[in-house]
């Protein structure tokens, strides 16, 4: 049995170029042997686990949905908001919620006054062939080691074929 202590894991921090999006995470699945960014089924787990930290006044990523991936969240500490297709919902320590495929969502820590981080467990089922859609910017991401982003234009099915 492989055992780790999440207190010993490094916290990887990210930020968008202009700083609107920021967060950090402890990659629990990778510490338990999952190969980062691998698409090989023998190097993946059936789910990914992350401990996500969202600083006060930030959101870790844009509003998005997944084509095939389910995501489960459990709030460890702090308070925040979840933006979803029906509006926003307040969240706090102890809350758990789930997003199925094709349901857009975004976590937000609006609490810039108390400067308290929002910390959550995130469990995703890690499907093969996953892609994501960003409704606000109308772009797609194709799940691959290169994390390619695309914007689509309406085309006829036979465009470029004849």
Each language-model region and where it sits:
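Short acidic-glycine-tyrosine-enriched beta hairpin
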Residues: 86-102
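Short histidine-centered beta-strand/loop micro-motifs
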Residues: 38-43, 61-66, 108-110
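Short, conserved beta-strand element in jelly-roll/cupin
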Residues: 46, 51-55, 65-84, 124
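Short beta-strand segments
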Residues: 61, 87-89, 132
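Ligand-binding loop in jelly-roll beta-barrel domains
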Residues: 101-130
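A short, N-terminal "cap"/entry segment at the start of jelly-roll beta-barrel domains
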Residues: 1-46, 134-162
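Histidine-centered metal-chelating micro-motifs
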Residues: 59-60, 81, 97, 102-106
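Conserved short histidine dyad/triad with adjacent acidic residue
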Residues: 32-36, 50-66, 101
């Amino acid at each position: 049995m492989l055992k780790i202590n999440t207190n010993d894991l490094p916290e990887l921090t990210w930020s968008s170029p202009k700083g609107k999006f920021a967060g950090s995470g402890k990659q629990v699945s990778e510490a338990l042997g999952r190969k980062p960014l691998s698409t090989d089924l023998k190097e993946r787990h059936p789910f990914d686990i992350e401990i996500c930290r969202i600083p006060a006044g930030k959101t870790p990523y844009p509003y998005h949905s997944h084509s095939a991936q389910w995501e489960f969240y459990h709030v460890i500490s702090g308070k925040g908001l979840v933006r979803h297709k029906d509006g926003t919902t307040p969240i706090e320590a102890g809350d758990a919620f789930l997003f199925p495929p094709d349901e857009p969502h975004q976590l937000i820590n609006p609490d810039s006054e108390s400067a308290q981080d929002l910390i959550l467990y995130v469990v995703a089922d890690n499907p093969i062939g996953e892609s994501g859609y960003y409704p606000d910017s109308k772009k797609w991401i194709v799940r691959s080691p290169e994390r390619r982003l695309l914007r689509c234009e309406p085309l006829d099915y036979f465009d470029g074929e004849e």
